Amino acid sequence: NQSAWQGVKNYGTKNNLVEGNKGYNYFVPKDPQDYQATINKVLDNDFSTIIGVGYTLKPNIVKAAKNNPKKNFVLIDTHADKIQNLASISFKNQEGAYLAGVAAAYTTKSHTVGLILGQNSKEMDSFKAGFIQGVTASSRKLHKHIKVMSKTVGNFSDINKAHDIAQEMYNQKADIIFQAAGKSGQGVFKAAKEVNQTNPVGQKVWVIGSDEDQTKLGNYQAKGGQPSNFTLTSVIKSADVAVEDLANQTAKGNFPGGKNLNYGLKNKGISLVQGNLSYHTWIKVQKAKQKIIDGKIKIMANR
């Protein structure tokens, strides 16, 4: 959400638009039951282009697009139906997740890693597929068997449940967990912090963040008081790049209605930060990234 909003702000600033109901604005539903009321509020303010972030908004945005044919609608993180005033922006989550799998495989000492997803969906499947393929391909090169544990929280806002799942994985010898669970993911960081605060800095467990650079969430004090960080790396989804691209197209009269714009490593919609990765591991990640861009590594979006 923050990244998409940044893209809107970037476009607005460059085109002398004012933040507010006469230029560009940001509306946040309290929960899924509030989606329709929030969309109605946006429609009342007479914006010409309305962007919905997250695949759970799809039914409401599709309905609004059909009922308001003179307005442009955009869905982020899912494929839209072929409606002339509705475009969609999707991301090759499997590409970033594959790189996270490479990073995890080359970093793990316990040969056990975990994956925690928000809920069961096609979009979440792409994270799982990419991560497992990245770990598997790297483990073959390392001539090691690396176990991948995978669990789903059930939603994107249950911090306590995600914490308990992560705690269980760490107890079962996982030393790295990749979380793609939205707000629920905060629980994974909480569990890692609890483990790490009781251990010397050299015996830490790690978290791989998603959507944005989550380095700050990994700050902690190790046993003995030494400040450290346990965010291994983060898979970045650059919705800001995609939204600004779309806004520029729309301003030129080329709104891509009925189309899906797909962003991955090649067009800078997905990336992975170096974070706390060793130089050796970072080089392995960069080589895998280039092979994906060149089409030499093919990643399935589901398993």
Q: What spans do the regions from the language model cover?
A:
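A residue-level marker of the well-folded mature domains of exported/periplasmic proteins
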Residues: 1-303
